[in-house]
């Protein structure tokens, strides 16, 4: 699996200390700009950065210029120094200290070779010793104890040896060196003795030599010749001939690397642009990694992390990838899968047959999420895997579970402090809260009727008086100018007169008098009255003395209204520093979740310390404090119905922590309840929920026994089908997988006139939306004779075959019964979908959850299978109906049965929804209405035709058998019992139909020919007895029968009444016209067409067919926009989707596409497939 790419044409070396890689411009190449510059660069490989930007490394950590280009590069620790050494085309040895590289002046350059240095190798037994090999057979041994003063010693020169292409020190025996040369000679040296020990020779150039990691006499040489691209395995105990040959490359091999931790892995690459993985022990090629566009000249495993290796090619890339591919291997992909893998088409396609030695588990047990433990025991080569429950410190969550159920009474049973009293008051309602705040409950007193005169009316002034019109106030009153009169009263400080006058004046005058009053009064009462009267209670909150906090809170509760929560929280903020308990009361009464949770969350650590003083373990103390916090929060939310307000990220983190702890104890249901409280946008919550949902699924079995494999895990190969642990729930659409259950038959409806058989074609339906069940009509075909073969009437929109309860289940024309190996009901004659059982235990090669491809459609099984739609076997065979057999019905138009049970590439059932009467078919429920056979719907994967060709056609099942001539079964005469049916072999679904004279074998993949087939054979085969009809209503009288029967042995064809012509379509603009797109839809067309034009050049040629098809379908969408056919909601969603593509926000674009397809399937036509492919291609390419 590709992890990183470096855009450099360079040789490279892995760092022995950390995940870094050094690159040096390779010799013998020319850049696109014909530059002769050379760079030495060091790159940080951050495997945690999985972004699209992080995939391609563009910024080296260190970059310096070099005087010459490199043939080879090594990075090695000598003990005191970390050295990078380069073999250059100028013949000089360049040495850098990796930790001190600043520029080219920091290198030490030594020239001893007379020509270019081709290869370098450090001695694993002597870290300061380096050997270099070059042209003309020159080999030098270097002492790098002091990197600034390298000391060289010539090992030997053999002019016949040619250029030294590769060096390798023996991994076991000290001082043993192997050198390979361009003339095919591989020489074994004793470096200390400067002595040649032996040679192995090949008649072709040898490009690379490697020693076996653990066997001192074994080595491999690679041949660079295109005519014989092989790797030879030698054992020096007999060097006369190679011990084995590894063949697989089509051109010369340039580089080989033998894994030091597991000798069963060997990498090779060469001129055929390929990188192969081998098992040298079995001489088997394990697989091929993604091919480059040019020669791959070096491949090397990382010594610290052998799962990783890098390959350099003349394509201009260094690719860093893993040994094991986790993207599904070479499994055949469906059309929809191609685009998901478009961006990874050149990645590895290898599934290792054995686990690397460094991954073989040294233990035999493993803990699993959700309080599970897996134990493995191996006896006599057989491994037994057991999955059980494991609980460490049992946590008590009963009280929280009770609260979540809504029962708060138990939470207040114990005396737990002042906060719990407040919570209890909140849980009991308003009266209890008023009582807690010492606010008396005002009871309404019954009104007392008093007919006596108003006592105050007797207190009115009486007697004669003078108006004193000269008084300005009196004059203003007389003239009705009350505002002026009030102003004069206020000016003379006559507040009582002003209040009396304001009663008859406007509200503005009243406010003026009140303000004047409050301005002159300084008492607390006046301040309080002002706050209440002007609704400025924040003045009381901010300025009143905190010793009266409870009275302030009561005032706020009485007059605060909608602002009470905010005002009470503000009062709590004032109290928090000086009086934590009273502040908590204010927060609780305010109902502010953020304030309450923030206060309690800050006290968790303090509570932990208190618990640890009582010799409680730190983890137990932490969980106890966390549990108290969660319990109080849960009670608070239930008591006040508090909603998330403000910033409650701290609370969400505590919810998640608590959920993880209880999930680890196996209480997955409680954990799910708390994760459900987190918003979907909260970071990481989606992954947590997915993990919980998977863990909560019931396992099929807790014990699995199988042969032990090389992975240390069971080898699953049993052909015995496993029972599925999942039973689909019946829905309004019925279930095509639900077992057939006998049900009481409903009385049959009266038959309408025979013209009901002519069903007008229905418009084509969306192939990607689940099909609703077919409507039930009142028409029932004529009843069959008890002795006649059972008719298998089929409705294209209701594919489940129906059975006549009055027809015998076995006869000479019966097809062989089929049996679904999974015990689910599938129509007879249809393909049975089988899938490999899913294993409950994970192994090395198991794919990640997000990488598992959707289930593929299996091919129909040609072997004899028995039908799962056969009626249940009765306890005793049924007796034939009383009376003579009735003649077979004639002139019946039926359609053949349609196989059901497959799914298309988008996960929806093929063939429509199952019949809602499937369970009643064997017990006499009426068969569905015969339907006119119509042309099949368009193939969702075929290229779209031009809009002018898209005539609306009725939708039928694309896998329906080809209709043919009706062949009448032989008549059964009265008193003559039909011969016993013989079990016949099932018809080959791929064979051509036989001639007329025998019931034609149906081909489920043949296109309709326009005729009508006779009734297929019943599902129950010969030898099987149908169950007796149980408490069923007699069938209704059928439509009038045609008195003319077809001649014996000949086909009977029935004319089909033509369907009424569809209404004329509204005038549309011509296809391809884009001038009438409304302004609201114009941005959709502009954005999609522009982005599509930019994306197309980046899609590989192999997908050209899909590109053309997608483009045609997109043009259909543009035609709809041009005709203003789209609904406003659809236009809005398409606008969002196009903007997401333009902004490269592909997850949002994919989510919007899925939302459109599922929420409005009726509005989605053929263009939706093109839009889906557009989004998938864009997400795969990502940048253009």
From Swiss-Prot:
Localization per Swiss-Prot or TrEMBL: Cytoplasmic vesicle, COPII-coated vesicle membrane; Endoplasmic reticulum membrane
Residue ranges, compositional bias (Pro residues): 751-763, 851-863, 871-888, 927-941, 968-981, 1026-1050
Biased composition (Low complexity): 695-710, 780-791, 958-967, 985-1000, 1008-1019
WD repeat placement: 4-44, 65-106, 112-152, 159-199, 201-244, 248-288, 291-331, 366-388
UniProt keyword annotation of Transmembrane helix present: no
Signal peptide interval: none
Region (Disordered): 692-723, 751-1079
Domain of life, per lineage: Eukaryota
Biased composition (Polar residues): 792-806
Protein name: Protein transport protein SEC31
Organism from which the protein derives: Yarrowia lipolytica (strain CLIB 122 / E 150)
Gene assigned in the entry: SEC31
